[in-house]
Amino acid sequence: MKPRRPISFTREITAMEPSSTSVSRPEWRPEAQQTLTDYPGSRELQEFGIPQKQSLPNEATAQQGAEFQQEQGVQQSTLLQKLLTPLAFPVPQQSFPSHKVHSDQQEATSQNGPGAGKVHTTQKELEHRDEHVGTAESGPAEPPPATEVEATSIAQAVSGPDKKLPTQTDLVSQERAEQSDPTAQQTPLVQGVKSDQGSLIESGILARLQKLAIQQPSQEWKTFLDCVTESDMEKYLNSSSKSNPPEPSGGTVIPGTLPSKQKPDCGKMSGYGGKLPHGKKGILQKHKHYWDTASAFSHSMDLRTMTQSLVALAEDNMAFFSSQGPGETARRLSNVFAGVREQALGLEPTLGQLLGVAHHFDLDTETPANGYRSLVHTARCCLAHLLHKSRYVASNRRSIFFRASHNLAELEAYLAALTQLRALAYYAQRLLTINRPGVLFFEGDEGLSADFLQDYVTLHKGCFYGRCLGFQFTPAIRPFLQTLSIGLVSFGEHYKRNETGLSVTASSLFTGGRFAIDPELRGAEFERIIQNLDVHFWKAFWNITEIEVLSSLANMASTTVRVSRLLSLPPEAFEMPLTSDPKLTVTISPPLAHTGPGPVLARLISYDLREGQDSKMLNSLAKSEGPRLELRPRPQQAPRSRALVVHIHGGGFVAQTSKSHEPYLKNWAQELGVPIISIDYSLAPEAPFPRALEECFFAYCWAVKHCELLGSTGERICLAGDSAGGNLCITVSLRAAAYGVRVPDGIMAAYPVTTLQSSASPSRLLSLMDPLLPLSVLSKCVSAYSGTETEDHFDSDQKALGVMGLVQRDTSLFLRDLRLGASSWLNSFLELSGRKPHKTPLPATETLRPTDSGRLTESMRRSVSEAALAQPEGLLGTDSLKKLTIKDLSFKGNSEPSDSPEMSQSMETLGPSTPSDVNFFLRSGNSQEEAETRDDISPMDGIPRVRAAFPDGFHPRRSSQGVLHMPLYSSPIVKNPFMSPLLAPDVMLKTLPPVHLVACALDPMLDDSVMFARRLKDLGQPVTLKVVEDLPHGFLSLAALCRETRQAAELCVQRIRLILTPPAAPLT
């Protein structure tokens, strides 16, 4: 016979006629060892010792089979009632509506053949046993259906209240589908049902249920922890938001400009398409629920309630794990929760003080945004993540599926982040005591500012680039940031060896796997890169988007436009009329600084082909970008637009071109319906200030004079730019006013840099954790633009090679690294899986011998991360760096910076600092005692340092990386108003047109926008400031990534449209 396919133990065959002998009953299988996959609690059911039998064969009649299963169901239900009654498990007394299928019963009867009498003996035994059980037990005369009793009681005892059983309709539909299959009616005969089976089941269930009842958490904790479940989360947040409404004066939530955003609804967080259906959830969806819940907490709970809840949970978890014995994991978990409690209690009053004075630094009551608010908001996000993780631990710590090591790593990472945020809060307090009311930037003399920065930049940063990467941003942006960080550290591993070229990108593909699976390694390597690699590395990394393959993919996903042409503006002087007297003219000279006269590149983008854009003169200026095949028919030219947008791209003055920003510029051209010309200015450090300003001003004046060639009449002109481009937009307008020529009708600057001084501000403190704008990177870009960045020796070697030499060299390096990189990638993973336990590292005190130099110069040099993977087995029996605490990552290298040849080789690859660097760059500590000494005195002439007033017993974590290449003193040129417009005199700022600023609440450059808007407002200049929430610096380049970035980009379009709209005529 063909055996029927297995079914769930909750399957039922039901009937609704009183005369029928078939009632609700389960079908059991005799193989107790078989794993059930249809029901989540089947594994626990096997642990109870319940035998799971298969259904009877169809050799008996339908009525006899029904009687047998009815008696078996009655016996099982009566037994479970007896067991569950003393344990106070609720037994449902109502049944769901049942349905009968007559055709199925007739089919089952017709299929029964000879041999029906084989079940008489078993049936008599069951009847005898049923009578015995019925006389021995007391219960209702008509017990409820056995399946409902068993399923409900076992689900409550084993699965908990959060696991739901299949509905009755689903069971009936499944029964119909299986009964309609003729092969499903053939089952093997159950023989030899033992009469003592009931007693075995009784003892097994009773022992397991009593043990489970003892392990149930207390009722008060069950009530408190219910809010972390998916079904009750929304109700909790809604109730908390109603009971604890946010105070308007508190400003704990930075208001954005996106009205469709509803933070309290954690199911509608952006980037995931709204609420997920109840039921099956993948790992990604669970991860999303974790992030969304923490984000919802940070927006729905006030600071005091959040801190008190976190402290209560930390104390409970600490007491629990302290009582779990001398295990290493339990001890570390207890210490982590003790640290969480200490840091939360110490941070809460400081944040409250910052919130109490934050409103004095806002632009106005309609725009409550500044660095102090952003710092408090970031700390609240960290507290919210710790609160959610603590609740998860408290509710799952008794489960056999609780991953102690994973949760320990998460908690240690966020505890390190909370410790550093507490240090930033004290730094912000220090700024409050030094600065005047309403001033966000450090106002002390330059020596005090350098001393303040010197203490700040020594803080540990790696914890913010591992597991905690981007915790302050919207959940939809975090996967991108993780991908970016993995690519960055992989790219940085091979940059110094390969210098430049395609080989760096190819080699990084083989090493990114380690950083993807080990967040601690990624954070440590990220910190090493941002502190030691020069501006040429960032220029090479940011220019990856300029690769033809990536730019082509981006263009395929962007809007299709009729015109996208690169123009080369000739370096020829021309005349421009003065605005005060059009009869008079002024000569606009071509750019001359540093490199002499040269053409200026600009890209013309237009959604429609307009008059003038296909003229012979413009075609003569077009620069070829490679062959293109145009298959579409030549469109009819549209009339000239009344407006024109002149765009200046960002990139820290050192990287990117208009090609990188082309995707969102095409969208602008479509939505605005105007031509856009984007200027490709020369980049630093090869062309420092004022070369970029001269080229942008020259291109702007050329566009105003030749607007007819660009498809516009030039009635309304808008200057638009982001980041460094926003700075250039403002300075170009200042230069146009100084020349007396036409200034634009308005400026739209997105997250601009308005001062390039090395001054501390509350928002710039956030650069400690920002993956896109670390403080050292900002300093290197400023140094490159101001002309103080020195050129490395390998740059001169590249110039000597020439273009063809670079191509030949990069090709050979690519082929070599393709082979060696694959070998290194395979070896690194083979070492992880096949490393011998007796392998020991070099002793910490052993120095390198001269014979070891050959190994240090091998072509495939091992990095810091590879050396970390080769660490010996520790107390926990692991050989991976991710099992170490963040504290170990912070201080392990202080005592012995060269613990292994690989470490020494890595530092040698980065390039040690020369003695001349010591006077201008920070030293790295060699011991913990030296670090403590630096907290009290300055290394410069022994002058007492200006440092944050840390309370007794609090010591932030210091970086263990090498020399930080960041100048302590700003070059005097950065005070030039054409470089730092925030420092411009009032008479210059009064010449600016209306300025519309769009900033990010979590951007280190937020205070630049706030202070510049305050200055313009105090002068009576028209200015607007819009602040968007939860987005990083550079959201325009991420416009296609998620809903928030698209809405923020649309806000910039609205500001431009406002500028291009002619003012209404006054009423007469």
Swiss-Prot record:
UniProt entry keywords in alphabetical sequence: Cell membrane, Cholesterol metabolism, Cytoplasm, Hydrolase, Lipid degradation, Lipid droplet, Lipid metabolism, Membrane, Phosphoprotein, Steroid metabolism, Sterol metabolism
Q: What is its EC number?
A: 3.1.1.79, 3.1.1.23
Modification comment: Phosphorylation by AMPK reduces its translocation towards the lipid droplets.
Instruction: Please indicate which superkingdom the organism of origin belongs to.
Output: Eukaryota
Active-site annotation: S723, D1003, H1033
User: Could you tell me which Pfam families the record lists for this protein?
Assistant: Abhydrolase_3 (PF07859), HSL_N (PF06350)
Region described as Disordered: spans on this chain: 1-76, 91-195, 236-278, 836-862, 890-913
The record's catalysed reaction(s) read:
a diacylglycerol + H2O = a monoacylglycerol + a fatty acid + H(+); a triacylglycerol + H2O = a diacylglycerol + a fatty acid + H(+); a monoacylglycerol + H2O = glycerol + a fatty acid + H(+); Hydrolyzes glycerol monoesters of long-chain fatty acids
Kindly list the biological process annotations in GO that this record carries.
cellular response to cold; cholesterol metabolic process; diacylglycerol catabolic process; ether lipid metabolic process; female pregnancy; lipid catabolic process; long-chain fatty acid catabolic process; response to xenobiotic stimulus
Location of motif Involved in the stabilization of the negatively charged intermediate by the formation of the oxyanion hole in this chain is 649-651
Mutagenesis / variant outcome for changing S863 to A/E: No effect on activation by PKA
Compositionally biased intervals (Low complexity):
59-76
Expression sites by tissue: Highly expressed in the adipose tissue. Also expressed in the heart, adrenal gland and testis.
Q: Please name the PROSITE patterns in this protein's record.
A: LIPASE_GDXG_HIS, LIPASE_GDXG_SER
Pathway per the UniProt entry: Glycerolipid metabolism; triacylglycerol degradation
Do you know which InterPro entries this protein is assigned to?
AB_hydrolase_3 (IPR013094), AB_hydrolase_fold (IPR029058), HSL_N (IPR010468), Lipase_GDXG_HIS_AS (IPR002168), Lipase_GDXG_put_SER_AS (IPR033140)
Phosphothreonine, modified sites:
T1068
* Family, similarity comment: Belongs to the 'GDXG' lipolytic enzyme family.
UniProt protein name: Hormone-sensitive lipase
Can you name the source organism?
Answer: Rattus norvegicus (Rat)
Task: Name the gene for this chain.
Answer: Lipe
